[in-house]
Amino acid sequence: DVIKRCSKIFTEILVGVVVNPSKESLFSREARSSMLEAIFKDYKNIKVMSFEGLLVDFASKNSVDAIVKGLRAMTDFDYEFQMAQANSTLAGFETIFIPSSPEFGYLSSSMVKEIHSFGGDVTSLVPPEVLKRLNNE
């Protein structure tokens, strides 16, 4: 949602895919990159790249002008605001916050994983590319 909306605002979007050591991801970084590439294949101004390390290092290496973060709720803001301050201090990057659309404000990967693990239907919660991978896991 946020990436698609950003594609109308910015001339070029670079989506960085990284492993967050504090989260247990269902899919590998490569699988997540592949799904994102499939989801955005028709968007000429969106490029997906995976990386390791700090976001500011990735952004610097790729001449990124600003970091965009999607926010679902105030709890997201608390964490992302701290990260934005750190990114500004470390490398001078500006962070732009964009709220998710209301229909996605409650949604999280943890919620999708839990619903799916109990056999619930997540068709309306994820893109078809993600649903296909979920059903093959």
Annotate each PLM feature.
Residues 1-137:
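Nucleotidyltransferase catalytic core that binds NTPs
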